[in-house]
Structure formats: C-alpha cells, structure tokens
Amino acid sequence: MSKDYGTPPENWREVYDEICKMKAKVVAPVDVQGCHTLGERNDPKKFRFQTLVALMLSSQTKDIVLGPTMRNLKEKLAGGLCLEDIQNIDEVSLNKLIEKVGFHNRKTIYLKQMARILSEKFQGDIPDTVEDLMTLPGVGPKMGYLCMSIAWNKTVGIGVDVHVHRICNLLHWCNTKTEEQTRAALQSWLPKELWFELNHTLVGFGQTICLPRGRRCDMCTLSSKGLCPSAFKEKSGITITKRKVKTIKRVKKRPASESPPLSPLSLPTDDLYYQSIEDKSLIKLEDLDPVDSISHMNEPLKKEPAADIDVDQKPPVAFHSTTKETRSLRRSKRVAKKSSQYFSQQSLQDIEDLV
C-alpha cells in the first residue's frame, strides 16, 4: 500500500494490466451509455453542452438510466437539447423529462440556473477551466475533471467516483476516506497519460466484476493470481446463507381411550332454592320435595282444575322461613362455585382428549 503521496504500490502496473484484460472481455454499461457517448459530436459546441448536461444528470444515477433520459431530452426538445431548449422550457416540463434520474427535482433547478449562467457569463458555451466549471450549480470536482477531458480534450485531473474510490482502496493503492483524497493520492504517483482512462476502466470493472455488493472474486484473475489483498475465496459462485428456522413444538395428543376416568362428585340431594341475583353466579333450581323428588320424575303430569279467583281477595303475604329444615336446604355460594368449576374443567379436558 502507498502510505505517502508520491509512492506508488509495488505491483500496481501488473494489477492494472490484469484489470484491462478482464475489462476488454466484457461490455459494461459505461461503454455504451457513459457520458462520453451521449453527446452529438458533429456540432462541437452542442457536444460540449450535452456532455455537461449528461454529467450533471449522472450523479446518483446509473448509466442504464442516464442513457434513456438523454435520448428523451433530445427527442422531446425542439432543438435536440441545446442551451436555448433549457432556457425556454419551464421547470415542470423539464422535471417531467428527467424524472427517472436521482434527485431530479434538484437537478431541474440546477439545469435552469446553469443555462442562465452560461448565457450571461460564458457567451452560451461551457467554461474551459475546472475552476469555472465548478462554479456552476451541481458541478463538483469529478464532473469538472471529466468534462475537461471529454468536452475540451484536456486532462487536468482524475475523475474519481464511487467505483474508483472503492476499488483503489480494495487494491490498497490508497487508504482514503473521500473521493477527493483518493484523487490527490492517485495523481501523486499515477502517470498522467492514464488519468482519463483510469476512470473508464475502473468504472467498467466495478460494474461487471468487482461489484459493490457480491464481488465476483471467483471470476477475477487478480484473486486467482494473488494480486488482490481484499479478495475472498468461495467454493462456488453461489453463496448459501443458513437461517435458523423456528420450529413449533407439537404436543402429542392423548387419545380419548387413555383419558383418566372421571371421579364421581358427591353433591347434596336436598331440595335447593336460590334467589336470583344480577351476576348470575349462583345456580337457581326448582323447589322439589326431598322425599318425592325421584318419584315425581316418573309420574305423568296431572292437570289440576283451575280454581276460582276472587278479584277482591288480597294475595298472601310472602315470608321466608327461618327454621332449621329450611336453612339446611340452602346451598352456599362456595359449594356451587366449586361444583361449577369442577364440571367445567372436566368438560374441557374431555373435549381436548377427543380433539
């Protein structure tokens, strides 16, 4: 790893050549829909403007989305995407045309402001220095250096995006936290003739093999030759992740034949009488003669003749007997509740056994 700026890694050239060989065998999205392919080269001034627009739209946007968006602008705008088109179109319509790119609301404002600044300060053309380019809204160092290389054919710096920053740190070419630190570290030792092509090569390599998620180290020759310090080996290209599956413990159901026999409960056979209450926690039974209670069940019902009712006669006064015999016929709440709970539990247990 290069610890100090200006000190190149020992095997950087061998590593870079291997990346170029792998990159030559695949077609990456940047090869066909990158910013350097989206401008009309038959008109140099228009090409420079379209390149700047493409770079401004490229931030937080994939190339597979950037390409169709640029074609949409060229087809829908009257001048085929020139400075006058951006000046004349309203923000709502422009926002609709670029709605697929990331942060399209903010980029709509940037494009309108950029067109006004170019018309007022730069005679309708884009600036020819990085410093002036970065004065435009929404244009940073990466866009500025790439625009100088593509639009003006002047390479004054390395355009470092997330792919270049990530891969250079994986290769231990630098140990940096930001894209600007990576650019300064690379420019301190990388030959200047490789500054422009480095971005295109590493971006394509990062889009096809050294992916941000799920790096294909099994396909990378840097891994097989031991040139990548961050490579990891897998048995196959398929990564199997084991998950813990929660299992529900099933209780073995007991058949009804094995259920324990019900124990008989001795209940008083005396006549029971309960007064009705609101919560219905007591059992209300009919009054029966304790001696003839069983014999009455087998006898047929007898209809008694209706007695003559005297309208003027007053109804008898009801009274409660307090004799010992009457008190013994009353059943306490405790006994009633206990017997009710017993039968409820036995019934539920029998139902569970049957199910």
UniProtKB/Swiss-Prot annotation:
It catalyses: 2'-deoxyribonucleotide-(2'-deoxyribose 5'-phosphate)-2'-deoxyribonucleotide-DNA = a 3'-end 2'-deoxyribonucleotide-(2,3-dehydro-2,3-deoxyribose 5'-phosphate)-DNA + a 5'-end 5'-phospho-2'-deoxyribonucleoside-DNA + H(+). [4Fe-4S] cluster binds at residues 210, 217, 220, 228. Keywords: 4Fe-4S, DNA damage, DNA repair, Glycosidase, Hydrolase, Iron, Iron-sulfur, Lyase, Metal-binding, Mitochondrion, Nucleus. Residues 122-149 form the HhH domain. The active site is at residue 142. The keyword Kinase does not apply. One of its GO terms (molecular function) is oxidized pyrimidine nucleobase lesion DNA N-glycosylase activity. Its cofactor is [4Fe-4S] cluster. One of its GO terms (cellular component) is nucleus. Bifunctional DNA N-glycosylase with associated apurinic/apyrimidinic (AP) lyase function that catalyzes the first step in base excision repair (BER), the primary repair pathway for the repair of oxidative DNA damage. The DNA N-glycosylase activity releases the damaged DNA base from DNA by cleaving the N-glycosidic bond, leaving an AP site. The AP-lyase activity cleaves the phosphodiester bond 3' to the AP site by a beta-elimination. Primarily recognizes and repairs oxidative base damage of pyrimidines. Also has 8-oxo-7,8-dihydroguanine (8-oxoG) DNA glycosylase activity. This is Endonuclease III homolog. The gene is nth1.
